[in-house]
Structures are given as structure tokens and as C-alpha cells.
Amino acid sequence: MQTGHPADGVYFGLMSGTSMDGVDGVAVRFEAGKPPAVLSEAFVGFADTLRDALFALQQPGGDEIEREALAANALAARYAVCCHELLRTAGLLPDDVRALGVHGQTVRHRPERGYTRQLNNAALLAELTRIDVIADFRSRDVAAGGQGAPLVPAFHATVFGSPDETRVVCNLGGISNITILPAGGGPQGEGHARNDTVRGHDCGPANALIDAWVERHLKQPFDDGGRFAARGKVDETLLAALLDEPYFRQNAPKSTGRDLFNADWLDAKLAGFQHLAPENVQATLTALTAATVADEIARHAGDCRAVYVCGGGARNPVLLDALATALAARGLDAAVATTAALGVPPQQVESLAFAWLAYRFNARAPGNVSTVTGAAGERVLGALYPR
């Protein structure tokens, strides 16, 4: 039985990030004035063939329309598997779910040209799940002159704000981004995106380069526990060369992705450093992520007392230690922990955010923070594909 806000109910959120290893999903109940209640979670991996196809689509090539359409169909099939697992583990039927918020797989992000492309066949996903699908969240923000990213700060403000301290939520996915939550906020139940004190933007590369390097040299999909980096030593000359990138000097609002920070970018930066052992490069890439995040926090949130990390990088203790060291080196007395310390497992944060954006869509409430993205104002985000 519905109570509270008409949009209240159970929502699914699906997120497949720039690591492209699979899709994380959550089933969550939203009720106005109450914190989100997670009912179940699931992860469904991508086959190497799908992953390779997605990577290939990030660079211009032949027959892109056909390849994109087939990859979108394959993504929808994997997303549907994740949804069926959420239904099973939460003991739900499709009719019990108000909507499914799905991010899709970013293959191009060019807000300066007025578009962003998150691959997914939302119509097929609705057909396979018999659940309303809400997708294409970023395009409306871009249409309003924004970056279309990051979109998670509004959700972060909803669940992670504090009345007593300035907090930073740092997502260490393929790309790193931060949300700055000044003291005086607090968990707000259904949340309010209209908060011009909330700030955030993309910082630079994180697991996109760290994973690419370990896969190249160890044939592993990620640096498990940061062990590869721990074997190496940071090369300060290489680090300086990596930091010599115009994006890092660009003012917010700003966003980035694999369009810039990819293997070609890294190989160009490594010219002249072929003598370095692979583990030293890995240590330096880890230091790059820590340095770029710490620089942005120092620049925009000098009064920060706590940094809460989510995303795949939250499972890398070497990266977390490097971030704490980089913050201290910049004079910040900020503790580093994962969002688990605030009651939300780090692997759930982004998929929860897209479930929340679906909830906001059904409420016809804004999902972006225009001071974060640079959009002309707050907008209802997403497009509906009925069951």
C-alpha cells in the first residue's frame, strides 16, 4: 500500500562504470523523509567479448552504428540478468518495482560538443524485465548547457551530509570525482537537489589507468589490494609529467572520461620512461590519482575533516593510504575512510544514486545540481520506457 509521496516505493538502480567489468545493481525502498532501505544487491560480470566491444566503441572506427546497436542489446541482456537476480534475492515480482534507473555504459562524453552517449537498449531492457525503465539521465543536463556529470552529488547530499563537519565524498571509479558537502547539511530522506552549497566535479583518472596497466603487464583485470603498486616506487619525474595535463588546471565545472584518459594518453606520457619497471609505473599511476584528488580537495574544501571513498578504488588500501598521505602533504587534517563508515557499502553508492534518480524522475523533481554541472538550472533527468 502506498503512503507518503506518490513516488514512494521499491526501485532498482544499475550502474556499469568506466572499468567496464560488469554491472552493479541494488533494490532499494524510498519513502519520503526516510533514509533509503536497501533490500538486495547484485553484480553481473561482462564477458570479455562484450568488454572488448565496449572499449573499441570508445574510439572512432568503422561501422560504429551496427557495432553500437549490437553492444547495446548485449548490455540490456546483462542488465536484465542483474535485475532478475535482484528480484530473486529480494523476493520481489516485477510489479512490485516502481521503476529501474539505469545509467548505461558511457562510450563517448563530449559535453563541449553538446552530447554524451551512454550505451543501452532501454526498450529491450523494459521488455526483458517487465519493469519501467528510466534511462539517459545525463542528456538533459547537457542540453541545459551542463557537463552532464557528475550527477551523484545530489544523492550524496541526501545521504551523507553532516550538520557538524564539511565532508568530501570521493568516488574512485575509472575516473575520480568528488562531492563537497559543507557543514550544516544532513541526511534528508528523499533529498533535495536544490542546494547551491553542494559542489563537485571530476578530478582525473583513477582505475581507468591503474587497471589498464595491470592488465597489460599481469593479465589481471585490476590491481588486487594494490599489491602491484605496493611492489613499486613512485617515480617523481614521471609523476610530474603525468600531472602536466591541461585538464588538471581547468576550473570547475568540469568532467572527463576515457575520451581523454586512456591507454593512448598514458603511452604518450610514458615516452622517455621505458626504462621504468612496470611496478614503478603502477605505483606512480596510483600516486597520480591520489595527487589529483588531493589537489582538488585542497583547492575547494580546505576545511574538510573527512573524506569518504566509494567505487572500486575503495577496495585498494594502497590507493587509500596514498590519498591520506597526499592530503596530509597539502596541510589537510582529513581522515580517509570508505562510505561503509556512514552505513553505505562503497560498491552500492553509484547504483543507489541511479535508483534515486529514477525516484526523482517519478516525482518529477530535479536530479542535477546546476552549480556542480554548470547547467542553466535544475532539471528533471531521464527518459521513461514503460514496462
From Swiss-Prot:
The keyword Transferase applies. The keyword Membrane does not apply. One of its GO terms (biological process) is amino sugar metabolic process. It catalyses: 1,6-anhydro-N-acetyl-beta-muramate + ATP + H2O = N-acetyl-D-muramate 6-phosphate + ADP + H(+). InterPro entries: Anhydro_N_Ac-Mur_kinase, ATPase_NBD. Coiled coil: none annotated. Keywords: ATP-binding, Carbohydrate metabolism, Kinase, Nucleotide-binding, Transferase. GO terms for molecular function: ATP binding; kinase activity; phosphotransferase activity, alcohol group as acceptor. Belongs to the anhydro-N-acetylmuramic acid kinase family. PANTHER family: ANHYDRO-N-ACETYLMURAMIC ACID KINASE. This is Anhydro-N-acetylmuramic acid kinase. It comes from Burkholderia mallei (strain ATCC 23344). The gene is anmK.
